[in-house]
Design a protein with these regions (language model features):
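Bulky hydrophobic segments
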Residues: 1-95, 101-122
Length: 122
């Protein structure tokens, strides 16, 4: 995928995630699973880490995994703060931040294992 398109897609996903985190969610369908919102947070921020990793790799950034993880964590913190400051319909939740970090960690571990396996196969 051309890196400009990948960069644009990454920015769009980041924006989409921010908007979905700040708008009223009562119009969204509810899932009857305990802590389903925490799974959604883990998935969303794991994906955020992945798309930033792929984008940074396409630009040949050293330590792309560390930087993409950092971007995703900081973005999650900013969104949680904005939920408390900008909206009346959303509230910041430390457990959401923990779920975000869990998703980021899972994706980072998978990427690390994949990268080490690829190097050994050469």
């Amino acid at each position: 995928m051309p890196r400009k398109i990948l960069f644009f897609a990454t920015i769009c996903y980041s924006f989409f995630l921010g908007v979905m985190s700040l708008v009223k969610s009562s119009h969204l369908p509810e899932i009857d699973i305990d802590n389903s919102d925490k799974y959604a947070h883990a998935l969303a921020y794991g994906l955020l880490c992945l798309v930033w990793y792929l984008t940074l790799c396409s630009y040949n950034f050293l330590n792309a995994l560390v930087l993409s993880s950092f971007i995703a964590v900081i973005y999650g913190i900013i969104i949680e703060v904005l939920q408390g400051v900008l909206t009346e319909v959303r509230t910041p939740d430390f457990n959401d931040f923990i779920a975000n970090c869990c998703g980021i960690i899972v994706v980072s571990v998978i990427i690390s294992i994949r990268n080490k396996t690829q190097v050994k196969n050469l």
